[in-house]
């Protein structure tokens, strides 16, 4: 049987790592014994907390050339967010909950994208549809991914399907959703021990928006001001990365996971467009965004709209 590489996006978050591991288990249950989960970056503190809690080993870092290899993408589809050699691979499946952009294949494939808050929610539905066993550690990974992507069900991306999935899984995983979720989110919200470069790259994605390449990074915290006290450090890193990677715009979204608000820091020639997108005035490159917590639903579409007019 041909080996199958399964992975989420670069700078993986909890959903990207968890969904790769979950999909590998799903494929094993279909009889694809050569399916294996990989990762395209370092494990975050939040994700490591979940892996340790449910006693699951982290996926291996992908270093292989994917030319001619069978792959399954989870939690992403845009090639600039994927493995460097993805255009040479044979994409068999995609399981995702994001917009579809910069994606094409030479042959047909199984593509499942749903407007839910988390890729793991789709995978939960797939297990139920096939009558596959959901082991406690798989249930735990599903819950962790859902809580992470939905910020404990507070994000506007969170749907009834996400909540219902987590509720159905909690007894299998033997966790209290509120207590476990808050502990996991707080594990990932510590920033004082991390460099500005680490924070800016921890959860960052690149997007093609019309003629512009935009980089959007997000940092979750319990104290926005503590993070942005290091504004000059962040600006230096963001400007250097923009020059090296040819980003037209770099947006750092610092999100308060307790109060569900964010502040943004923006660099780039088109930064005034970001103020226009959110109908705010940038003050020294920064602005407060009340109620904004979701990059996918509350940041990317708004900036895309002003950059493609």
Swiss-Prot record:
Reactions catalysed according to its record: diphosphate + H2O = 2 phosphate + H(+)
Signal peptide: none
A cellular component annotation (GO) from this entry: cytoplasm
Binding positions (Mn(2+) 2): 15, 75, 97, 149
InterPro entries named among the record's database cross-references: DDH_dom (IPR001667), DHH_sf (IPR038763), DHHA2 (IPR004097), DHHA2_dom_sf (IPR038222), Mn-dep_inorganic_PyrPase (IPR022934)
Entry's EC annotation: 3.6.1.1
Pfam family, one: DHH
Localization annotation: Cytoplasm
GO molecular function (one): manganese ion binding
Top-level EC class as recorded in UniProt: hydrolase
Main location: cytoplasm
Family membership noted in the UniProt record: Belongs to the PPase class C family.
Protein name: Probable manganese-dependent inorganic pyrophosphatase
Protein source organism: Staphylococcus epidermidis (strain ATCC 12228 / FDA PCI 1200)
Phylogenetic lineage: Bacteria, Bacillati, Bacillota, Bacilli, Bacillales
């Amino acid at each position: 049987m041909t080996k199958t590489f399964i992975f989420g996006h670069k700078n993986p978050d909890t959903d990207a790592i968890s969904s790769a591991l979950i999909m590998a288990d799903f494929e094993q249950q279909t009889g694809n014994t050569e399916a294996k989960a990989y990762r395209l970056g370092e494990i975050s503190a939040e994700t490591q907390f979940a892996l340790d809690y449910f006693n699951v080993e982290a996926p291996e870092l992908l270093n292989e050339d994917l030319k001619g290899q069978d792959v399954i993408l989870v939690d992403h589809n845009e090639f600039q967010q994927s493995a460097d050699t993805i255009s040479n691979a044979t994409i068999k499946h995609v399981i995702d909950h994001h917009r579809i952009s910069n994606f094409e294949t030479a042959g047909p494939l199984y593509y499942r994208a749903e407007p839910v808050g988390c890729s793991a929610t789709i995978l939960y539905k797939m297990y139920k549809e096939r009558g596959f066993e959901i082991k406690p550690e798989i249930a735990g990974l599903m819950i962790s991914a859902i809580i992470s992507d939905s910020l404990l069900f507070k994000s506007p991306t969170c749907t009834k399907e996400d909540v219902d999935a987590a509720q159905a899984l909690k007894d299998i995983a033997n966790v209290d959703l509120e207590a476990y979720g808050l502990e996991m989110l707080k594990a990932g919200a510590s920033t004082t021990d991390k460099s500005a470069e680490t924070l800016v790259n921890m959860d960052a994605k690149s997007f093609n928006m019309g003629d512009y390449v935009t980089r959007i990074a997000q940092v979750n915290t319990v104290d926005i001001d503590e993070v942005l006290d290091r504004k000059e450090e962040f600006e230096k890193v963001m400007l250097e990365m923009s020059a090296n990677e040819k980003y037209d715009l770099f947006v750092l979204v610092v999100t308060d996971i307790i109060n569900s608000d964010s502040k943004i820091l923006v660099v780039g020639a088109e930064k005034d467009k970001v103020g226009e997108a959110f109908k705010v005035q940038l003050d020294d490159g920064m602005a407060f965004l009340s109620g904004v917590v979701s990059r996918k639903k509350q940041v990317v579409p708004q900036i895309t709209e002003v950059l493609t007019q």
